[in-house]
Structure formats: C-alpha cells, structure tokens
C-alpha cells in the first residue's frame, strides 16, 4: 500500500459519505512542501455535512492518528499530511533492495492474454519513421502489461495484400530489373512504386491495369503469386533486420493475406444474422443505432471484400486462437472511424467481447512540419536514421569517456534508445517533429540523459563496492532524498496509470523526473563520504538505478552499465 492509499484508507474510516477510491482521486500534492506532502480538500464534504470546509478539515485532522504521519494539520479547507520520512524511506529502500527488478511487479492480469496488433508495415515498401510509432508504442505496452501480470501476444499484421501489389506488378513488368531488385530489393521496389503512382496521375489506364493484375493475384494466377511471394520474402528479410536493430520481437506475422480464406465465413455469419443490407449493389451493415453515420461496407458491387471484412475475420480468429482479455490495435488516429465500425459490427454480430477491443491511436511524425508520404517519396527511412543516431551517440561517448571498452555496443544502445525514447515521451495522441539532434542529446528530456544518470549511479556503486544484500538498516529524512523516495514509491501506481491509459509516455516522463531528482541530489550530496548516512545514501542510489533501469526496460530501451 503506497502513502496515498494509506491516507485514503485512514480517511475512509472516518468519512461516511466517500469511499476510499473517491478519496484517492481527491488527494493532492501541495506545490509548497511547507504545506505538507499530501493534502485532502474538504470542499466536497461541505454539502453533505452542512458545515464549512474549514471546520470539516479541522475535525478530520484531529481524528487522524496513524503512526505513518509525522503530523496532520488543518490549513483552511485542507487537511495537510506530513509524512514520516525516516519510516517511509526505510520501507521503500527495503522493498527495492529485496525485490530488485521485480519491484512494482503486480498480478492484475492473472496471466490472461493481451493481443497487441502493432508495427504492421506494408510489404515492398521501406520501413520508415512513420512505422516506428506503432512498433515502439506496441512493444512498450507489451512490457507494461507483462509487468502487471498479463501474457502478451504481439501480432505484426503485415500489409501483404491489396491493390498496391497490382501497381507493383505492373511497374516491375514495365520497368523492373531483376538483378537490381535482388541487389537492393526495398530501394528498387520503392522507386518502382513511386514511379507508377506518379505516372498513374497522368495515365488512368495504369490504375485499371493494376486492378486487373490484383484480380489475377486474388484468383491464384501463377505469375502474379510468384511475384507477390518474392516481394514479400525480400521485404521480410529487410524488416527482420530492422526489428533486430530495434530489439523488437513478434509472436505472429499473420498479415492481411492470411485472412483471404477466412472472409467468406464472416460474410456468411452476417448474412445468416440478417445484418447485410443492399446499397447501390454493395453489401453493408447499418450502424446508425451506434451513432455511426456511415454503414460498414462489407462487400463491393464487384464482389470484392474490404478492409473491414478482413479485420472482422482477424478479430474472430484472434479471439478463437488466443481467448484474449484485451485486444489492442496500435494504429494511427486517422483510422479511428474504422475501429468504431469494427467494434460496432462485432457487437451487432452478438459478440460481447467486442468491448475488450481498444484502438490505441497515435499522432503523426512530421519533418520540418511537413507530413511524410511513401507514395510521394517524401519519407525518413529508419535504417539510415538508426545508423546516424548510433554514429552521433558514439561521438558524444568518445568525448565523455575515451577509455570506454565497448564503445560500439554502448553507442548502439544509446542511439537506438534515443530514437525510441523521444517517440515514447510524446503523449501518444500528439504528433512530433522528427529532430535527430534533439533526440541524441545528453541534455534535456531525452533517452541518453536518463541512460547517463543510470550509468553514473553504477559508477558510484562500483566505487563503493556496494552490495544491497549486505547493507544494514537504512533510512533518510532530508528533503532532496525525500523527493526521490516519493517517486520510487509511486512507481507501481505510475505503471498502472500507463496500462490503464495505454500511454507509455507516463513511464518516460517518470524516468525523466527520477533522473532529474537524482542528478540534483548528486550535485548537493557527498554520497561516498564517510558518514552515518553513507549506507542509506548508497541504498538510495541503488534503488534509483533499479527503478530507472526497469522504467527504461518498460520502454524497450537498454541501460548501459558504463557510458
């Protein structure tokens, strides 16, 4: 039980009109530490109690007598709690030094499955910074849900089907060079894709030709299938190399093509339940009762099935295969209307588990304020970007620590971590402008700043030869160590908030705050000097390092021991 929960529990025992959960939501952290560590505003009780909030606050303060508080005083309409710093710091440091990286582990999920649809790049197109968001947000959510007791299934729903393959086949047959594609598959396929789109703007017959080749592909034409398979295989080799760079793994690569033979069954169920309506030759599901104006288009007039039909098939397959407690789609916010339709159609089909489906949208990455587009060739490719980030990180590491042994390995962890952290510290639904220089900086709210704080602590612990299991009883009561203790104590709640809101930025911002608080402490405290507090200060340093490393791990970022 953390401090806020303890206060809420104590208050709930003497307040009849509010339960513990409601009290917890009302608790505040005073801006001025002289007003205590936590405050409870009595305004909400005034109407029920028919008393002035000041009087209620005074009565509550008088009734509080827990050992955990140094003192409890009423200041106007607030009950201000001053916590016993020594007792709480001892409790927190004991917990972290005992549990180590398992500190803040929880079993909320009871080992139930969470399916995470993430990354999902399009075959035969380069892996760009635009795909990075879904990849790193999904990967971080996987770590976060595992931390609170769920099992996760990471699905890479590859874009390996659709009209774009018709376009690519036409482009390859017109202008392609087999040897050039074999040598540099993605580069060559991208050039072909950009060229056919540009030419199709002036020559509509290319669009029709592409549709025809896609129809051949759908009908199992040997040449079309062979080219499609080749494009897919070459792309996957490239993608897997990048996923290895990012240290991201998947449990399934079932993409769009996997559901080709599963969509007719969806159409049959919709038909049997009388949900399909005719509209201009197409078959649709009306969703007006869900407040959705546009019907879900299930089958076009030419008999072709659509994106939503495929996603319905995927949802049914995943529920059957994984019996998920939650199914999360980490997909850009421009797809919000699609996922509202998906959930509504599943609800219409009688599947109550549609409530367990969540679209986790995210904002766009721009470059100098401009939207990125593969079709127009205006794209930031991930592979050269990672190489550049690693190179910049290495320059800074060599300047800071020229004697470091494994510079290349550390530079890779810092460069890749910098890109991931910058993405994840941004509130998910906001976009951000891509700025590699800002990402790789060791100053400011960046991944390298947090990693460097961790490495600095490891250096202190090595100098002291500190082993937590041999440390004695420790406690601290100074103001600067207290700021760190409060953050560490809050870590389990931070993880829960990140999971509840599908928001890794909550963890990233926490890591920044903890690193900043420790750096401030380090600047003002002689940690290694012989003193009665030395062991306790080292224990605090150790606990900070454990929590920083774990916070970074939850973001999919490595924490080098030396930098």
UniProtKB/Swiss-Prot annotation:
A Pfam match: Arg_tRNA_synt_N
Gene Ontology cellular-component annotations: cytoplasm
GO molecular function, one term: ATP binding
Domain of life (superkingdom): Bacteria
Keywords: Aminoacyl-tRNA synthetase, ATP-binding, Cytoplasm, Ligase, Nucleotide-binding, Protein biosynthesis
Motif 'HIGH' region: chain residues: 121-131
The EC number(s) this enzyme carries: 6.1.1.19
HAMAP family given in the database record: Arg_tRNA_synth
Subunit structure and binding partners: Monomer.
Protein name: Arginine--tRNA ligase
């Amino acid at each position: 039980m953390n401090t806020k929960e303890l206060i809420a529990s104590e208050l709930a025992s003497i307040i009849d009109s509010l339960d513990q959960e409601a009290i917890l939501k009302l608790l505040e952290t005073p801006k001025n530490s002289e007003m205590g560590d936590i405050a409870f505003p009595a305004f909400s009780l005034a109407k029920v109690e028919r008393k002035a909030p000041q009087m209620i606050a005074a009565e509550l303060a008088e009734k509080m007598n827990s050992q955990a508080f140094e003192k409890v005083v009423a200041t106007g309409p607030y009950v201000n709690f001053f916590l016993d710093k020594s007792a709480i710091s001892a409790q927190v440091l004991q917990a972290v030094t005992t549990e180590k990286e398992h500190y803040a582990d929880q079993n909320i999920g009871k080992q139930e499955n969470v399916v995470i649809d993430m990354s999902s790049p399009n075959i035969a197109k380069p892996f760009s910074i635009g795909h990075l968001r879904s990849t790193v947000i999904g990967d971080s959510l996987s770590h976060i849900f595992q931390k609170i007791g769920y099992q996760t299934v990471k699905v890479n729903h590859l874009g390996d089907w659709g009209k774009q393959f018709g376009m690519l086949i036409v482009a390859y047959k017109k202008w392609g060079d087999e040897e050039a594609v074999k040598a540099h598959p993605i580069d060559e396929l991208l050039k072909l894709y950009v060229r056919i789109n540009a030419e199709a703007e002036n020559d509509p017959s290319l669009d029709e030709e592409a549709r025809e080749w896609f129809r051949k592909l759908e009908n199992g034409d040997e040449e079309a299938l062979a080219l499609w398979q080749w494009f897919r295989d070459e792309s996957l080799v490239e993608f897997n190399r990048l996923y290895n760079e990012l240290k991201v793994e998947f449990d399934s690569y079932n993409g769009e093509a996997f559901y080709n033979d599963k969509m007719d069954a969806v159409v049959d169920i919709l038909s049997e339940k009388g949900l399909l309506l005719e509209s201009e030759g197409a078959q649709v599901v009306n969703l007006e009762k869900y407040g959705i104006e546009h019907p879900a288009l299930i089958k076009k007039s030419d008999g072709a099935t659509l994106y939503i039909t495929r996603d319905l098939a995927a949802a049914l397959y995943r529920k059957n295969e994984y019996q998920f407690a939650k199914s999360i789609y980490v997909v850009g916010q421009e797809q919000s209307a699609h996922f509202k339709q998906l959930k509504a159609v599943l609800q219409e089909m009688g599947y109550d588990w549609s409530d367990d489906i969540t679209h986790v949208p995210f904002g766009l990455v721009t470059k100098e304020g401009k939207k990125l587009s593969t079709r127009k060739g205006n794209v930031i490719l991930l592979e050269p970007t990672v190489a550049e980030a690693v190179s910049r990180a290495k320059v800074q590491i060599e300047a800071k620590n020229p004697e470091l042994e494994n510079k290349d390995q550390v530079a890779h962890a810092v460069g890749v971590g910098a890109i991931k952290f910058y993405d994840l510290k941004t509130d998910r639904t906001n976009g951000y402008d891509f700025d590699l220089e800002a990402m790789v900086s060791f100053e400011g709210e960046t991944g390298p700043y947090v990693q460097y704080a961790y490495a600095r602590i490891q250096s202190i612990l090595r100098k002291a030869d500190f082993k937590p299991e041999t440390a004695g009883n420790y406690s601290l009561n100074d103001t600067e160590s207290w700021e760190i203790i409060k953050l560490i104590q809050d870590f389990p709640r931070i993880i829960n908030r990140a999971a509840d809101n599908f928001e890794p930025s909550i963890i990233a911002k926490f890591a920044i705050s903890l690193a900043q608080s420790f750096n401030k402490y380090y600047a003002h405290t002689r940690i290694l000097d012989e003193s009665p507090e030395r062991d306790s200060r080292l224990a605090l340093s150790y606990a900070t390092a454990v929590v920083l490393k774990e916070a970074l791990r939850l973001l999919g970022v490595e924490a080098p021991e030396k930098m």
